[in-house]
């Protein structure tokens, strides 16, 4: 099933911009024949067409120490992440901090530890790959709430079935409130976070997180939060 880069490049700009490609992906995904014999071989080998189209594979970028991402100031946060994901509890982490505090840096450092098999990484996390989705980008390509809900649901399903993906939702606050440039998808995301079976990292602005927590205490209760403080290192 090919509906990623080749299909996208073949479409004219008008169709790309108005979300036609998202609708096309959804329809083709639904038509994909169901294979028997357990999890399809595609999935067991990490077949992730939607993630490949809409997300960045952070692990590929940082593998082999390609990026100097780890800062001493973030070692405690990284240790907490390993502990949470290595335990049997809810498999989600929310990195909370101000803009520029280093949330994305922490995600990159964590991805590097896993993909390069650093000492201290639990066996269950070794070589897991971190894919980052930007909430604002997803909102911009979907034609409406229904299409966005379908797209996010299928991406979550794809990540879960791949068995080797940790999904990072950057600027996640945009998915938990209504407003300009944001859409409340709590009805989609909250059950996933509460179940805790899909490993997810959320990054959220600290002030927006506080506001959302007050409005949605059930959501706040479902999240394992880690505060990220700005680094003073040069």
Where are these regions (language model features)?
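Alpha-helix N-cap/helix-start and coil->helix boundary motif
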Residues: 206-207, 233
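Conserved small helical "lid"/interfacial subdomain of P-loop NTPases
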Residues: 228-234
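Structural beta->alpha junctions
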Residues: 140-141, 231
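Histone-fold recognition with a strong bias for associated Lys/Arg-rich disordered tails
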Residues: 1-139, 147-155, 159-162, 166-174, ...
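Conserved helix-to-beta-strand junction in the class I
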Residues: 192
């Amino acid at each position: 099933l090919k509906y990623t880069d080749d299909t996208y490049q073949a479409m004219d700009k008008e169709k790309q911009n108005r979300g036609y490609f998202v609708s096309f992906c959804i329809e083709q995904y639904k038509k994909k024949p169901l294979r028997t014999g357990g999890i399809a071989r595609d999935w067991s080998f990490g077949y992730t067409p939607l993630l490949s189209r809409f997300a960045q594979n952070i692990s590929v970028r940082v593998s082999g120490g390609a990026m100097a991402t780890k800062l001493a100031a973030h070692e405690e946060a990284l240790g907490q992440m390993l502990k949470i994901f290595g335990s049997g509890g809810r498999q989600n982490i929310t990195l909370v901090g101000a803009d520029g505090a280093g949330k994305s840096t922490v995600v990159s450092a964590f991805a590097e530890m896993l993909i390069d098999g650093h000492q201290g990484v639990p066996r269950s996390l070794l070589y897991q790959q971190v894919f980052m989705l930007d909430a604002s980008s997803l909102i911009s390509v979907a034609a409406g709430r229904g299409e966005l809900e379908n797209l996010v649901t299928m991406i979550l399903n794809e990540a879960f079935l791949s068995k080797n993906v940790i999904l990072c939702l950057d600027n996640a606050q945009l998915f938990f409130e209504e407003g300009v440039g944001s859409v409340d998808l709590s009805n989609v995301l909250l059950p996933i976070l509460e179940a805790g079976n899909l490993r997810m990292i959320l990054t959220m602005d600290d002030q927006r997180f506080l506001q959302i927590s007050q409005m949605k205490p059930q959501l706040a209760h479902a999240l394992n939060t880690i505060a990220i403080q700005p680094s003073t290192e040069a």
